[in-house]
Amino acid sequence: MTASSVLLHTGQKMPLIGLGTWKSEPGQVKAAIKYALSVGYRHIDCASVYGNETEIGEALKESVGAGKAVPREELFVTSKLWNTKHHPEDVEPAVRKTLADLQLEYLDLYLMHWPYAFERGDNPFPKNADGTVKYDSTHYKETWKALEALVAKGLVKALGLSNFSSRQIDDVLSVASVRPAVLQVECHPYLAQNELIAHCQARGLEVTAYSPLGSSDRAWRHPDEPVLLEEPVVLALAEKHGRSPAQILLRWQVQRKVICIPKSITPSRILQNIQVFDFTFSPEEMKQLDALNKNWRYIVPMITVDGKRVPRDAGHPLYPFNDPY
């Protein structure tokens, strides 16, 4: 049985498998959370922009706390600061709104969702007349200093980053008095992120993989993109070990000490996704999966401009995916 959590530099234990909640519809996410907690999940990944934190809060209220199924201190809850709330004055109100929605007194981890800021306000995707996004000039280093105050106030136990490049991580570290503990990025065998993971681990950050199964349910999915869950190497290992393809992909990550947050609302899959600690890959099997890397990124936010689908933020000076890693 391999260890099912990693130790953050804050001393917190972060479970290697958590339940992702992106695209989990209100009306379905509450039951998914309650089921996940009942089968042993102790890590839930949330974000204000997912629009479902209120319902997640209802599930947490029923299942977590004194006299409930799960003591609060056994649960690791992450949420994320959205792009419209990067202005230092907006950071604390944003986390307080998330805490109220989740019905929690503190978060275990709070991430800056993206490095760039959108125009301030309550519209999560402020747009110009031509369909492009309205940005705000707040730099992530200013936002980081405001996030640090949340730790001092006890609202948040640890801070982290999401969708930041290696250069941007170092930029935050250069001003941080509270060091980031986690980087959350897209990661799976087609986008192995080896350089970025090594960069983080050398600096005391753990890495969380989002879309670890390849996110085949995206709205902007392209018909000819490769499907990770149908990859022959993955299917062959699944057959050999008597496991599902998803379990193969998750086992590869946890064996690399990378945290995963697969999203599901289906009980059988929620259960399956956490059953990855009772088998191991040989070094040769790990190499087979490592060899699938092709730096294929599924999650690039797209918008329609003049009738064409284009990457939404690729022209922004803080866009993270123009860097080599």
Swiss-Prot record:
It holds the Pfam family Aldo_ket_red. It is an enzyme of class 1 (oxidoreductase). The record marks 13, 30, 34, 61, 80, 97, 127, 134, 145, 157, 240, 257, 263, 287, 294, 308 as: Not glycated. Its EC number is 1.1.1.2, 1.1.1.372, 1.1.1.54, 1.1.1.19. It is found in: Cytoplasm, Cytosol; Apical cell membrane. Monomer. Catalyzes the NADPH-dependent reduction of a wide variety of carbonyl-containing compounds to their corresponding alcohols. Displays enzymatic activity towards endogenous metabolites such as aromatic and aliphatic aldehydes, ketones, monosaccharides and bile acids. Plays an important role in ascorbic acid biosynthesis by catalyzing the reduction of D-glucuronic acid and D-glucurono-gamma-lactone. Functions as a detoxifiying enzyme by reducing a range of toxic aldehydes. This is Aldo-keto reductase family 1 member A1. It comes from Rattus norvegicus. The gene is Akr1a1.
